[in-house]
Amino acid sequence: MLLKAKNNNYMYAKTTVNIRKKPSKKSKNIGKVYWNEKIQTIKKANKNWYKIKYKKKNRYICAKYLKKKPYKCKTYSSPSSNSFKSFEDADCITDSTKLAHGRLKRKYHLDYRSGVWMVGNRYCIAVGSFYAGEKVGVKIDLVLSHNGRKHTLKCITADSKANKDTIKNHRVHKDGSVAEFIVKTSALPKKALLMGDVSYAGKQFKGKIVKIKVYK
């Protein structure tokens, strides 16, 4: 018997998960959802698979990668009213897989439109130690405000800003930037390179950072 999905018909991904055409790992891969993304469940197809709604069609996802509630975060107000967003070339980050920085770096893929490196659906950044210590792989949502509208930019820590270079209890860099983006300098749009500001790398980066949501 097929079981109805609970929790208002929504669940959340524990990690990056493939969406299948049929309830089998051998079935065609239709797409994917990322960590903590909300998924509309229809019912449980069997003990291992959920039937879900994906792009207006019925698809399937492995049940063990879903959870009933979203991951919790701690929200901070931005310590800076500056819209400036600095950048760091990925070549400045170690390639050594003996360190967490290097292991995460192996997962990088480039957003060719902006020149900013990503892991999954999250942009790679460095922030002050107030938010994540010196840890890499910490998921952070930056809430930006531009022309009176707010939007969320999903990020992940790939490096940390040195305490000697930060102010306001290590929450903001001395140059006024809250987040420093990890980039491939040669792939940056010309204006972003000229201004030294990732805000000019794409519309998703525009605006002031008003909230910083840190997932623990």
What does each model-found stretch correspond to?
Residues 28, 34-37, 135, 174:
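Residue-level recognition of short, solvent-exposed, well-ordered loop/turn junctions
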Residues 75-216:
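Solvent-exposed, well-ordered loop and adjacent helix/strand elements within mature globular domains
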Residues 24-28, 127-128:
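Short, solvent-exposed loop/turn positions at domain surfaces
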